[in-house]
């Protein structure tokens, strides 16, 4: 699967997670509805579903992972920034096959596309601090 397919999966997952948080609708129904409107040919659908199901299922744990690296409460974050951080922390915590630098970069790129003017700087700062303090930058992946 091409990396760009996974990037599109993250972008789609972000939009569905945003919608889910605002509407409190069923995440699977939201995903199906969202994908009806998209060209699914260039999206890693399996990864898209992994993200939305994994994040919504383990949302409290992911949020707890984030809290020590935020200088404000989760409730004070914008919905987009919170969703981006959830995707990035999910990848850092659950996907050892994805290099931490990729997770950080993808979070920054999502913030540039969907976030407010300076949200990419905020996302970068939070993720850099988390990677350093949690020791992800020293992680060795054995294949």
Curated annotation (Swiss-Prot):
UniProt cross-references to InterPro entries, sorted A to Z: NusB-like_sf, NusB_fam, NusB_RsmB_TIM44
Keywords, ordered alphabetically: RNA-binding, Transcription, Transcription antitermination, Transcription regulation
CC per GO annotation: cytosol
Record carries keyword Endoplasmic reticulum: no
GO molecular function list: RNA binding
Disulphide bond pairs: none
UniProt GO BP: DNA-templated transcription termination; transcription antitermination
Function: Involved in transcription antitermination. Required for transcription of ribosomal RNA (rRNA) genes. Binds specifically to the boxA antiterminator sequence of the ribosomal RNA (rrn) operons.
Similarity field: Belongs to the NusB family.
Entry-linked NCBIfam families: nusB (TIGR01951)
Name of the featured protein: Transcription antitermination protein NusB
Lineage of the organism: Bacteria, Pseudomonadati, Pseudomonadota, Gammaproteobacteria, Enterobacterales
Gene (name only): nusB
């Amino acid at each position: 699967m091409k990396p760009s397919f996974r990037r599109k999966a993250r972008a789609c997952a972000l939009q569905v997670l945003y919608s889910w948080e605002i509407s409190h609708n069923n995440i699977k129904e939201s995903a199906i509805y969202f994908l009806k409107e998209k060209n699914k040919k260039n999206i890693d659908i399996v990864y898209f579903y992994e993200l939305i199901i994994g994040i919504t299922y383990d949302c409290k744990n992911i949020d707890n992972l984030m809290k020590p690296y935020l200088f404000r409460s989760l409730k004070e974050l914008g919905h987009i920034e919170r969703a981006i951080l959830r995707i990035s922390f999910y990848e850092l915590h659950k996907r050892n096959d994805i290099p931490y630098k990729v997770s950080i970069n993808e979070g920054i790129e999502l913030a540039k596309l969907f976030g407010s003017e300076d949200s990419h700087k905020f996302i970068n700062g939070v993720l850099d601090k988390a990677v350093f303090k949690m020791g992800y930058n020293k992680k060795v992946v054995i294949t």
